[in-house]
Regions:
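Short functional hotspots at interaction and active-site rims
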Residues: 1-191
Length: 191
């Protein structure tokens, strides 16, 4: 089977990371709202579990995650727009990095906008390079695993009682990535 140029670059990227020559981070946004996504629950016989869905606020989260569980995240009560993403990247890389850092992003409109493209040269001067995933490949973006873990495993039903409590729980998890909350990526197959 012939491998595409993108697959070869993807493979080289991880070889460079394994050699310690670059740092690779995966970036993405997700939303958390009061309607829980708990797919199943266990209870004792004759015990009833109730989760009352409520319409409440939505907490938007944008962040970067490495395979070593190093994360940098930002939250907003507004939708994530290009300006927000650019400001986050600028805050994350305020000056030239010693070791090159590759930021892997999906092809969302926010990531492909003119503003994002206009910033790439300045970021590259700081040793930050943006790598876009192939289209329709969200499974390759490791931070998607973080969002799933948060929504399906780490958030508890009682965290959805109020928007304030949900916000607090989400921020607690985000602050604990790498210490209390870890994902094992070493066995993951990428291609």
């Amino acid at each position: 089977m012939k491998r595409s140029a993108k697959q070869l670059l993807w493979s080289e990227l991880f070889d460079l990371e394994a050699s310690g020559l670059v740092e690779v981070y995966f970036g993405d946004a997700s939303g958390f709202w009061q309607t829980p996504v708990v797919a199943r629950a266990w209870q004792f016989a004759n015990e009833e579990i109730r989760i009352v869905p409520k319409r409440g606020g939505r907490l938007a989260v944008f962040g970067f995650l490495s395979k070593a569980n190093v994360a940098r995240t930002w939250t907003s009560k507004k939708s994530i727009k290009t300006r927000f993403v650019v400001d986050c990247i600028d805050e994350w890389v305020p000056e030239r990095l010693g070791k090159p850092r590759v930021l892997v992003l999906d092809n969302a409109q926010v990531n492909r906008s003119r503003l994002m493209q206009s910033k790439r040269e300045a970021w590259e001067e700081k040793n930050l390079y943006v790598f876009y995933l192939p289209t329709y490949s969200p499974h390759l973006n490791l931070i998607e695993t973080l969002w799933r873990q948060m929504k399906y495993l780490w958030l508890k039903p009682e965290d959805y009682i109020s928007f304030e409590r949900l916000t607090e729980a989400v921020k607690k998890i985000l602050d604990g990535i790498g210490s209390q909350y870890k994902i094992k990526f070493k066995d993951r197959v990428f291609i």
